[in-house]
Swiss-Prot record:
One of its GO terms (molecular function) is porin activity. Widely expressed. This is Mitochondrial outer membrane protein porin 4. PANTHER family: MITOCHONDRIAL OUTER MEMBRANE PROTEIN PORIN 4, VOLTAGE-DEPENDENT ANION-SELECTIVE CHANNEL. Forms a channel through the mitochondrial outer membrane that allows diffusion of small hydrophilic molecules. The channel adopts an open conformation at low or zero membrane potential and a closed conformation at potentials above 30-40 mV. The open state has a weak anion selectivity whereas the closed state is cation-selective. Involved in plant growth and development at the vegetative and reproductive stages. Is important for leaf and pollen development and mitochondrial membrane potential steady state. May be involved in disease resistance. It comes from the Eukaryota. Induction: By the bacterial pathogen P.syringae pv. tomato. It holds the Pfam family Porin_3. The modification Phosphoserine is found at residue 76. Consists mainly of membrane-spanning sided beta-sheets. Disruption phenotype: Dwarf plants with lesion mimic phenotype and increased expression of the pathogenesis-related genes PR1, PR2 and PR5. Delayed flowering, impaired development of anthers and short siliques with sterile seeds. One of its GO terms (biological process) is response to bacterium. It comes from Arabidopsis thaliana (Mouse-ear cress).
């Protein structure tokens, strides 16, 4: 629903995407093809250092069902089945990986005009249970998440946060790492082509502060340039060019001023969708 609050995992997502999305310092190739029946086929290859990884996936979308099947270069088969409108305002996702018989998981999401609930449980004898909830609206929401390990009967994660989105401004304040750190994010969309963002993290255990600032600017309708700088001395840049509809090439670079003997990190990603 358009007026419903975002899931807890999406609080602060705009800043995360601005500061991290498309910064790939490897070599990646993606080919997406769509059949006449609407089935999508995607082949992905990734070269990381001297290693190569790849996978082939098939995505089928029905009226109330989505089936995603993926086979990777390690001979693993991953399957995800999404059932929409299982109940009013609810959907369920069943996922598992072969040959890992303990990888099965069931996710359920319920969306209300003033609340969003997410739950996840492993389909094994000692599952990990994840619960998250947000209340409010599309503009202002408050929420939290917990993870419970049934094997050790202990809480492995608990976080809380608040998010704000309105008129080109997105801000979030999240208490995470079991209360050990506080993360604040801010994104300002100056105009349809330019955005600025920042992230500040305060770690209470060692009184350490870290921050990152970044920007995104559309040079023209086909080219986007992103930059980011952190207090650790790292500076990064992304240039993405759409050279045909839904196909783009991305160049990434990062320089660490504190590692003067190391070469800058460089990355290249090519995505094709005929």
């Amino acid at each position: 629903m358009g007026s419903s609050p975002a899931p807890f995992a999406d609080i602060g997502k705009k800043a995360k995407d601005l500061l991290n999305k498309d910064y790939i310092f490897d070599h990646k190739f993606t080919l997406t093809m769509l059949s006449a029946t609407g089935t999508e086929f995607v082949a992905t290859g990734l070269k990381k250092d001297d290693f190569f990884f790849g996978d082939i996936s098939t995505l089928y979308k029905g009226q109330n069902t989505i089936v995603d099947l993926k086979i990777d270069s390690h001979s693993s088969v991953s399957t995800k089945v999404t059932l929409k409108n299982l109940l009013p305002s609810a959907k369920a996702v069943i996922s598992f990986k072969i040959p890992d018989h303990k990888s099965g998981k069931l996710d359920v999401q319920y969306v209300h005009p003033h609340a969003t609930l997410n739950s996840s449980i492993g389909l094994n004898p000692t599952p990990l249970l994840d619960l998250s909830a947000t209340i409010g609206s599309q503009n202002v929401c408050l929420g939290g998440e917990v993870s419970f390990d049934t094997a050790s009967s202990s809480l492995t994660k608990y976080n809380a946060g608040i998010g704000f989105n309105n008129q080109g401004v997105s801000a979030a304040l999240i208490l995470e790492d079991k209360g050990e750190s506080l993360r604040a994010t801010y994104v300002h969309t100056v105009n349809p082509t330019t955005s600025f963002g920042a992230e500040l993290i305060r770690r209470f255990s060692n009184y350490n502060n870290s921050f990152t600032v970044g920007s995104s600017h559309s040079v023209d309708q086909f080219t986007v340039v992103k930059t980011r700088f952190s207090n650790s001395g790292k500076a990064g840049m992304v240039v993405q060019r759409e050279w045909r509809p839904k196909s783009h090439i991305t160049f990434s670079a990062e320089y660490d001023s504190k590692a003067v003997t190391s070469s800058p990190k460089l990355g290249l990603a090519l995505a094709l969708k005929p």
